[in-house]
């Protein structure tokens, strides 16, 4: 027998590894609406299977917990059982030797804290209501509730105009979202059970590119009611689009010269060309929406007072977005050469881009705005562009695709560095950034916090500092008019109404803080429905499109179609769109990858889909 042997995985271990891969795909695709008690019991069994059997809390205790959770699921448990589960889980958490045991105990305790009422429902009524309400994942995870399986099936049938009509029922920004949406609909796609999520955003782009001119739906008879909408961003425009269809005359008051909000002034042309955004806006305005551009609402000279709007319109919707920048709060931040990312992107949108030719640029921040500023600075001729972020690259809130694209175009990511001070010359211009090296520390609020590393600060020479650490809302004029706010955000209720302010509604970034485009659109949709009710009506929005029935097909594993991009060396020299659309063959293949969850595997869709709201 050999003294030592090269270790190889056994056949059994190879099978187990494959099972782990299958399990990972299942976890990724776990849709909203699953029974949380069932999920807790299933994960507990996995933890128990991983135990080494050395310590009693893990070897015996997890088995006892399993049995008690099975009693809950089988309707055999009592409320005393629930108390015993809690005590047992705490004992395991406090006494297990390693993370296999104590993390299992923590998971059960966290479950009891987060969904105790579901445990009680099983105990008292013998069942959980979640399975009866389980939604189609892509539809449920789209903030606007777009009928994703429906429009994918229409694309598969090459009915592109109908696909656009169906999307517009819930989201009027078809083209814009096809290019820049963060596609939360894809995160829990059941196609992950087989191979990989359907490229939903890419299919939407194909429909938008090939639908031709799709006119807006006809509006209802005029109601005689008027609605003032403050802010012409995605939320305000969406609300106007639906309210106008309901027969209410809408007027948008926009302080800038162009509509679109951050879609126009915050997203560079290489991601969302202005002419493509104009397609969506023109469709909205074609319903009869009126606009008053270069008009500010406030209490200053030349501004229209909020009181006047309230007196002259039947309802008011505030959707002013979040268009001001946050400060670093460090010495030197007011120096020449320090600019906000929001202002920089706004200047680009207005056709007045800064000249960074030959400059060394540092961008502070880790979100999508920081990436937009970074990639724009490269296109504006910067010699070097570095992104400074106090956490790790993995902790950045920007889309990973955007981060990788910035790196591919030449940007450097300075992770775990926090800005400490900005150095200037005698003329008050930036010369260097002083950065404090960090290490990753304790997890608070779901993300690890940076901590002092003990290393000396470093000096990074630079000519320009772009600050992209967040956005604020200009709420003061509205607060003076009596609109309640907390930390600069308006306090709106779930239906978008403002408490004790009859006929006043608010939504979008000015309520939630800076969020995604699709969330702003969803807020406008919610506001439109509830403003319609407030005005004394109950109009319905529908598409009139019939979704084709699914065909019985053998859904064999098939790779996801990825969106191709222009060559890096070429695209970083201009602001032309980076991403290429799908070909006809790619779109057809991708559309047929959809598993049609609207018909298979989800009882909530039995008998029909949501055709109106």
Each predicted region: which residue ranges?
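Feature captures the FAD/FMN-dependent oxidoreductase FAD-binding
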Residues: 221, 226-228, 278-330, 421-434, ...
């Amino acid at each position: 027998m050999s003294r030592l042997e090269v270790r190889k995985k056994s056949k059994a271990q190879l099978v187990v590894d494959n099972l782990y891969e299958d399990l990972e795909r299942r976890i990724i695709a776990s849709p909203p609406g699953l029974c949380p008690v069932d999920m807790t019991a299933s994960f507990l069994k996995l933890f128990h299977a991983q135990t080494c059997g050395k310590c009693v809390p893990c070897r015996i205790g997890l088995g006892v917990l399993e049995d008690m959770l099975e009693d809950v699921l089988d309707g055999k448990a009592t409320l005393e059982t629930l108390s015993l589960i809690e005590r047992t889980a705490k004992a395991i958490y406090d006494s297990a030797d390693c993370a296999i045991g104590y993390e299992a105990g923590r998971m059960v305790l966290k479950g009891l804290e987060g969904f105790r009422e579901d445990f009680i429902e099983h105990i008292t009524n013998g069942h959980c209501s979640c399975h009866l309400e389980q939604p189609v994942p892509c539809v449920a995870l789209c903030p606007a509730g777009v009928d994703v399986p429906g429009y994918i099936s229409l694309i598969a049938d090459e009915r592109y105009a109908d696909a656009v009509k169906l999307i517009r029922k819930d989201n009027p920004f078809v083209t814009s979202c096809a290019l820049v949406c963060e596609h939360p609909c894809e995160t829990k796609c059941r196609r992950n059970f087989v191979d990989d999520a359907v490229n939903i955003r890419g299919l939407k782009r194909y429909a938008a590119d090939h639908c031709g001119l799709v006119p807006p739906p006809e509006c209802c008879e005029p109601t005689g009611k008027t609605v003032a909408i403050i802010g012409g961003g995605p939320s305000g425009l969406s609300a106007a689009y639906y309210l106008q269809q309901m027969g209410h005359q809408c007027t948008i008051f926009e302080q800038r010269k162009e509509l679109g909000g951050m879609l126009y002034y915050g997203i560079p042309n290489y991601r969302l060309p202005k002419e493509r955004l104009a397609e969506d806006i023109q469709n909205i305005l074609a319903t009869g929406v009126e606009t008053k551009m270069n008009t500010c609402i406030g209490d200053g000279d030349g501004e229209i007072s909020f009181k006047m709007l309230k007196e002259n319109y039947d309802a008011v919707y505030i959707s002013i977005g979040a268009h001001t920048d946050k400060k670093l709060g460090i010495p030197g931040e007011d120096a020449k050469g320090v600019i906000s990312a929001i202002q920089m992107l706004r200047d680009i949108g207005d056709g007045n881009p800064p000249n960074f030719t030959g400059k060394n640029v540092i961008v502070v921040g880790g979100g999508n705005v920081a990436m937009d500023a970074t990639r724009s600075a490269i296109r504006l001729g910067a010699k070097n562009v570095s992104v400074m972020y106090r956490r790790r690259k993995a902790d950045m809130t920007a889309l990973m695709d955007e981060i990788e694209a910035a790196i591919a175009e030449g940007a450097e990511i300075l992770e775990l560095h926090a800005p400490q001070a900005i150095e200037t010359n005698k003329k008050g211009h930036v010369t260097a950034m002083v950065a404090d090296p960090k290490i990753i520390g304790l997890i608070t609020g779901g993300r690890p916090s940076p901590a002092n590393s003990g290393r000396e600060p470093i000096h990074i020479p630079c000519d320009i500092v772009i600050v992209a650490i967040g956005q604020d809302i200009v709420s003061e004029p509205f607060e003076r008019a009596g609109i309640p706010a907390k930390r600069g955000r308006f306090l709106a209720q779930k239906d978008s109404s403002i408490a004790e302010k009859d006929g006043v509604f608010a939504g979008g970034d000015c309520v939630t803080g800076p969020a995604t485009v699709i969330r702003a659109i969803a807020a406008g949709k919610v506001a439109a429905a509830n403003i319609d009710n407030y005005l004394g009506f109950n109009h319905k929005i529908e598409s009139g499109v019939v979704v084709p029935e699914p065909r019985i097909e053998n859904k064999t594993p098939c790779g996801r179609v990825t969106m191709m991009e222009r060559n890096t060396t070429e695209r970083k020299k201009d602001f032309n769109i980076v991403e290429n659309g799908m070909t006809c063959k790619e779109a057809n293949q991708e559309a047929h990858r959809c598993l049609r969850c609207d018909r298979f595997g989800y009882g909530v869709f039995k008998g029909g889909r949501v055709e109106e709201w």
